[in-house]
Regions:
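Generic structural marker for isolated residues within well-ordered, non-membrane alpha-helices
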Residues: 87, 339, 393, 444-445
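Residue-level preference for well-ordered alpha-helical positions
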Residues: 91, 270, 343, 397, ...
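Extended, helix-rich architectural segments
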Residues: 1-158, 167
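Extended, regular secondary-structure scaffolds
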Residues: 114-246
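Short coil/turn segments at secondary-structure boundaries
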Residues: 102-106, 117-120, 270-279, 352-358, ...
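Activation/maturation switch segments at domain boundaries
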Residues: 432-484
Length: 484
C-alpha cells in the first residue's frame, strides 16, 4: 500500500494499519506466476547467466478452482415477489455471474475481495441525488491490496476505504472512496445511523486533487453498506491484518515452491536429456578464428586431411555416446506427491490434482463423492459467498428504492440457492427444507416449487386441494360419502 495514502488517511483522523500489505504482495506475486525464488544463476564457459525456473502456476489455478467450486451459473438468488424482477434485471445489467466468479478468485488469492456498488451519471441538487435515463449500476471489484479497513468490530469491517489508481490530465492519481457508518439527526431530532460516502483524489505526494463532476460527499440515509467483503473461511494468524482475510495458499508457499522445483527438474531432464556424443580432442579442429569444429558439423564432416596419422575414428576412447536417463516415473511420482501436499494445504483435499495415464486430471465433480474434506471446506467458503451475495443484493435494492424510486425493499429476505446440488446433495437439501417448514421458517409452497417442479401458482392450488381433503377427513367424510 502506498505510504502517502496511509499518511493522508491518518491526517484525516483515521487509524489504518499498514504492516500487512507486504504479505499480501507476496500472495499477489505468486498468483502472477513468478517470484524471486524462480530466479537462479548458471555458470557456463566461465560466464554467469541468469535463468528463470519453469513453473506450474498453481496459485492461479488453485484460486480459479475455488471460484468454480463455490459458484455455478445454475445457482439462483430468490427474494420477495415485489423485489425479484427488479433484482434479476439489475444483476443481469452488471453481469453478476461473471463478476462473482472473479470476486471469489480475488478473495482466494489475495485473501479479501471487496465489491463496491456505484451508480454512474447521477447528479446532486441540494441534499438530494437525482438519476436520469443515463444512470446505471456499476459493481467494482477490489483485491486485498486496494482495501483499507478503518473500523472493525468482531472481525467485521464496518468502515472502509477503497483505493484505485486513475489519471487526471495524464497524471497518475489515487482515488480513495471512504464508506463510514455515522450517526445523523433526523428532522424530528432523533438520531439514526447512515453511511457517509466520501470521494477523494490525491496525487503522488498525498495532496488532494480536484476532479470535476464528482460528488465529494453524500449520505445514503441507510445503515446498509454499499460494499460487501468476501474472505476465505480461514482465521487470519496476523493480528495486523485488521479484518482482512488470509489467502487460500497463504500457508502453502513452501509446497508451491516444492511443486515448481519438481516440475522444473522434470522439464530440465528433458531439456538436458538429449543424446550426448563425446569426442577425443584428436577428432576436432579449429577454424581460423580459433572456434572448435566437431566432426558431426554438417558443413565440416569431411575435414580429415589425407595422410593423417589417425586412421580409425571408431577406436575406443575417440568417440563415446551417452544417453541420459530421463527418470520419467521418478519425476512423475515426486511431482504428484508435492501436488498432493499442496492441495491438502489449500483445503482441496489430498488428491484433488491427480493425474493418471487414462483420464488426465480427475475433476472436482468426480472427486467430491469420495473425499469429504473438500466438501466440508467448500461448504464453509460457500457460506461466506452467500453472505457476500446477499449484501450486494441488499445494496442494489437500497439504491433502487432511494435513487430510482422503485417499489422495492432492501430489508426483505434474500436467499442464495445452490441449484445444482454440488455442495449440498438433493436429499440433504430436502431434509433442510422439511426442518425449516416444521419450524415455521419456510412455506410448503417453496418446497413444492423447488423439488416438485411446480410453479408457485400450481403449488398453491395443490396445497388448497390437500387442505380441502384434510378438512373432509377430519369430518369423517370420504369420496364415497360425497357420492351418496
Amino acid at each position: 500500500m502506498n505510504s502517502k495514502i496511509i499518511e493522508y488517511l491518518r491526517k484525516a483522523g483515521y487509524n489504518p494499519y499498514n504492516d500487512f500489505y507486504p504479505i499480501i504482495e507476496t500472495w499477489l506475486n505468486l498468483w502472477k506466476g513468478k517470484t524471486d525464488f524462480h530466479k537462479y544463476k548458471v555458470v557456463y564457459d566461465d560466464k554467469t547467466y541468469e535463468r528463470e525456473m519453469y513453473s506450474l502456476g498453481m496459485p492461479k489455478r488453485i484460486a480459479e478452482d475455488w471460484a468454480s467450486i463455490c459458484w455455478s451459473e445454475k445457482d439462483t438468488i430468490k427474494t420477495s415477489p415485489k423485489n425479484q424482477k427488479y433484482l434479476d434485471n439489475k444483476l443481469q445489467e452488471i453481469k453478476f455471474n461473471k463478476q462473482l466468479v472473479l470476486a471469489i478468485e480475488k478473495s482466494a488469492y489475495s485473501g479479501t475481495c471487496g465489491a463496491v456498488l456505484r451508480v454512474k451519471n447521477i447528479k446532486k441538487f441540494g441534499d438530494e441525488l437525482v438519476t436520469d435515463k443515463f444512470s446505471k449500476y456499476d459493481l467494482i471489484l477490489m483485491k486485498a491490496d486496494q482495501i483499507i479497513p478503518l473500523r472493525v468490530e468482531h472481525g467485521k469491517i464496518i468502515d472502509c476505504a477503497f483505493v484505485s489508481e486513475t489519471r487526471i490530465q495524464s497524471k497518475k492519481v489515487y482515488y480513495i472512496e471512504i464508506h463510514e457508518l455515522v450517526r445523523r439527526k433526523a428532522e424530528d431530532g432523533e438520531e439514526y445511523e447512515t453511511y457517509k460516502i466520501k470521494n477523494v483524489y490525491i496525487d503522488g505526494e498525498g495532496k488532494e486533487v480536484e476532479k470535476k463532476g464528482i460528488l465529494k460527499e453524500y449520505y445514503t440515509n441507510s445503515d446498509i453498506a454499499l460494499f460487501s467483503i468476501l474472505t476465505p473461511p480461514i482465521d487470519n494468524p496476523y493480528p495486523e491484518a485488521n479484518g482482512l482475510g488470509f489467502s487460500v495458499y497463504g500457508n502453502a508457499i513452501d509446497q508451491i515452491y516444492a511443486c515448481d522445483t519438481a516440475y522444473h527438474n522434470f522439464v530440465m531432464d528433458y531439456y538436458l536429456g538429449g543424446k550426448k556424443v563425446f569426442y577425443n580432442k584428436k577428432l576436432t579442429r579449429r577454424d581460423d578464428k580459433g572456434n572448435i569444429i566437431y566432426p558431426d558439423d554438417v558443413s565440416k564432416q569431411q575435414f580429415q586431411i589425407v595422410g593423417d596419422e589417425m586412421e580409425n575414428v571408431n577406436a575406443d576412447g575417440l568417440v563415446h555416446e551417452y544417453n541420459p536417463d530421463l527418470r520419467i516415473e521418478d519425476n512423475k511420482s515426486g511431482l504428484q506427491f508435492f501436488l498432493d501436499l499442496l492441495s491438502f494445504k489449500c483445503g482441496l483435499g489430498t488428491k484433488y490434482y491427480q493425474f493418471d495415464g487414462s483420464s488426465g486430471v480427475v475433476t472436482a465433480t468426480q472427486y467430491m463423492g469420495d473425499r469429504q474434506d473438500l466438501t466440508i471446506n467448500a461448504k464453509k467458503y460457500r457460506e461466506n459467498v452467500d453472505e457476500f451475495v446477499e449484501n450486494i443484493c441488499a445494496g442494489i435494492l437500497l439504491l433502487g428504492r432511494l435513487l430510482f424510486k422503485e417499489n422495492v425493499n432492501e430489508k426483505d429476505k434474500i436467499e442464495v440457492i445452490n441449484t445444482d446440488g454440488f455442495l449440498v446433495s438433493e436429499e440433504d437439501l430436502k431434509e433442510r427444507y422439511i426442518e425449516e417448514i416444521a419450524q415455521g421458517l419456510r412455506s410448503k409452497t417453496s418446497y413444492m416449487v423447488r423439488f416438485m417442479g411446480m410453479t408457485e401458482e400450481e403449488a398453491k392450488q395443490e396445497l388448497a386441494r390437500i387442505n380441502e381433503e384434510d378438512s373432509l377427513s377430519s369430518l369423517g367424510l370420504t369420496n364415497e360419502d360425497e357420492g351418496n
